[in-house]
Design a protein with these regions (language model features):
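Class I SAM-dependent methyltransferase "Motif I" SAM/SAH-binding loop
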Residues: 53-60, 66
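Class I S-adenosyl-L-methionine-dependent methyltransferase module
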Residues: 68, 72-142
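Class I S-adenosyl-L-methionine
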Residues: 203-249
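Class I SAM-dependent methyltransferase Rossmann-like catalytic core
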Residues: 2-49, 61, 68-69, 81-92, ...
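Residues lining the SAM
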Residues: 165-169
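A short glycine-rich, Lys/Arg-flanked "PGG" loop and its adjoining helix->strand segment in the class I
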Residues: 177-193
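Conserved SAM-binding strand-loop segment of SAM-dependent methyltransferases
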Residues: 140-151
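A short acidic, Gly/Pro-enriched loop at the edge of an enzyme's catalytic core
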Residues: 150-163
Length: 249
């Protein structure tokens, strides 16, 4: 897959000292294609006919929306395989908990993507409902696959583009450096082109402390990396994306 054109980088914001979100476990929380387009700097039109994987996709509507735009999208998540009722309950529980935290810690958020918390919640809940409707129809057609990092159930180079949002770095307190390294290598393994990971900060909005070391070790393994500033920031510090590709690819 040819590298996608990068627009000029916007100004970066500075992290602020605030109490982090309480994330004792990975939340089942998702976003829309429009939000993915901004946080990953994607042009959906350019992706038509491409094979795209959304890793740790949760209840994001990206795959449903992308498929409607003739993008060959697949989503993978450890909770896929659960019944529709089970996932619906999980969405209700995790969304209620997450938005209660979001409203309680307004200094952790920026209103660049949404004008206010109500708009953000409405958009995210609409994305989840679209996911649930698509999951009910297409789970058995392998659009939604059960799997988890750092071991994905796909052959080498299956996808032109691999995306992973709000898992790596955000849950650094839960997953150690070795897990992050293994996860990055696995994402690259299943990609024939690029990997894009967003964001590069933790639940406190601070940059991932091990990023420089991670990039060095990936380079030693033949994986090139680039930090891409993006025109997106909902969570403070979430204004950059990591792009990975095999060197000379």
């Amino acid at each position: 897959m040819p590298a996608l054109a990068f627009p000029p980088s916007p100004l970066r914001s500075s992290a602020i000292a605030v109490s982090p979100l309480d994330l004792p476990a990975v939340s089942f929380f998702g976003r829309s294609l429009a939000e993915y387009a901004r946080c990953f700097t994607l042009d959906p039109v350019a992706l038509r006919g491409r094979d795209v994987l959304d890793v740790a996709a949760g209840p994001s509507s990206f795959t449903a929306e992308a498929t409607a735009r003739r993008i060959a999208a697949v989503a993978v998540d450890p909770l896929y395989g659960a019944t529709l009722d089970e996932l619906t309950r999980r969405v209700q529980e995790d969304y209620s908990r997450m938005f209660a935290q979001i409203r309680a810690k307004p200094r952790l958020f920026r209103f660049k993507t949404f004008p206010n918390f109500a708009a953000a919640e409405s958009d995210r809940r609409a994305a989840a409902q679209r996911f649930l409707a698509d999951y009910e129809t297409h789970f058995l057609h392998n659009r939604y696959v059960s799997g988890a990092l750092p071991h994905l159930p796909f052959l080498d180079g299956t996808f032109d583009l691999v995306l992973c949002a709000h898992l790596l770095f955000v849950y650094a307190a839960r997953f150690d450096f070795d897990w992050h390294l293994a996860a990055c290598r696995e994402l690259v393994r299943v990609s024939a082109g690029e990997v894009r990971i967003h964001p590069l900060c933790g639940a406190d909005g601070k940059p991932y402390a091990g990023l420089a070391r991670l990039r060095r070790e990936l380079r030693a393994a033949g994986i090139a990396s680039q930090v891409l500033a993006v025109d997106y920031e909902f969570f403070v510090g979430s204004d950059s994306t990591l792009v990975l590709r095999r060197e000379n690819s």
